[in-house]
Amino acid sequence: MSALYMIVGTLVALGVLVTFHEFGHFWVARRCGVKVLRFSVGFGTPLVRWHDRHGTEFVVAAIPLGGYVKMLDEREAEVPAHLLEQSFNRKTVRQRIAIVAAGPIANFLLAILFFWVVALLGSQQVRPVIGSVAPESLAAQAGLEAGQELLAVDGEPVTGWNGVNLQLVRRLGESGTLEVRVQEKGSNVDSTHQVRLDGWLKGEDNPDPIASLGIRPWRPALPPVLAELDPKGPAQAAGLKLGDRLQSIDGIAVDDWQQVVDSVRARPGQRVQLKVLRDGEVLDVALELAVRGEGKARSGYMGAGVAGTEWPAEMLREVSYGPLEAVGQALSRTWTMSLLTLDSIKKMLLGELSVKNLSGPITIAKVAGASAQSGVGDFLNFLAYLSISLGVLNLLPIPVLDGGHLLFYLVEWVRGRPLSERVQAWGMQIGISLVVGVMLLALVNDLSRL
């Protein structure tokens, strides 16, 4: 992936999401008669600044990791008598709640807009047809077979593997029954299968829901002919060349690239013997595999790839919506992803999901770059998901976040008077500690994935 895509994708993502979030606060504050002193995108040294006719200073700062809206407030500085009514602290509790809630709400509205555009643009999806089912796996025990096409998971229709994965992610760490409706191969007959779950993937790092059921999606065969080599990878170091065809690994014949991938991933750090066909001659090559990940996520890495192949037209479907249908899709996806984000947080707190699944700025930058390089639709999807995460996280009742301020104002509304400044200060200290701790944990997780 190009570093340029990563940098540009990250800057665009943060710039758009932060600006929209802060604009929510700004717009409602203005409507409530609060004087806004500064609207800043980023922190630190201002790179660009200007003032509008209301005296608000607009700033684009050097560190693009957030932003803020500074409002007139007697608690922060002395306010001239003629401006007292424009102070944030002089507004009613309802007005203050509206101003604070407007930021996260803006993020949800932005996600709806992005999902609406994606639905209008349409996408080409691979039909979720099962390629193979591992013996004795959860899928095999439920009676699922190769050639069946998944139609719905837990009653939710699915049109592609992304939809399947989303529905499975919702069940991580749970016990019970997963209902899968499929269409039998070569017929229009539907059947429903019950997959038994028992603390499914509870606490697992980087879970792969589809693979863990024992399902491998159908895909065209890929001959194991090398078309890509990592200049610093084990394959290059061992002397493999573009055009080499792998015939066996440790004496086990391979005729499809997926066999190579499975074999390599299962041997992290091991030395393997390859038989390679090159220019009509069979060569023996010893190769020491690298290691990616840690713990249960450890896997072997070879540093080689093959060329893609054309998918049969019957295995692809175009999915798009009209303007009104797209609105429904956008609302539904935003609601679903918001609930999924909240559910994931709950499961992490209960230990049903590993905290190692938390991602920080490095992972965000990588995904931003990859999605930007992949196309407009993928990048807009990424922005929508990130905007939802920003909205949900900001609504958590943790002092220092918008949700913490909302909690204070709700308590004030119920009590008829605000909490003491000492209690609020304690809350802020606790909130800052929690937020910094989570940010450090996410950064450590990012670094462990490098």
From Swiss-Prot:
SMART domains: PDZ. Belongs to the peptidase M50B family. Pfam families: PDZ_2 (PF13180), PDZ_6 (PF17820), Peptidase_M50 (PF02163). Residues 199-291 form the PDZ domain. It is an enzyme of class 3 (hydrolase). It is a multi-pass membrane protein. It comes from Pseudomonas aeruginosa (strain ATCC 15692 / DSM 22644 / CIP 104116 / JCM 14847 / LMG 12228 / 1C / PRS 101 / PAO1). It is found in: Cell inner membrane. GO terms for cellular component: plasma membrane. The keyword Metal-binding applies. PANTHER family: MEMBRANE METALLOPROTEASE ARASP2, CHLOROPLASTIC-RELATED (PTHR42837:SF2), REGULATOR OF SIGMA-E PROTEASE RSEP (PTHR42837). This is Putative zinc metalloprotease PA3649. GO terms for biological process: proteolysis.
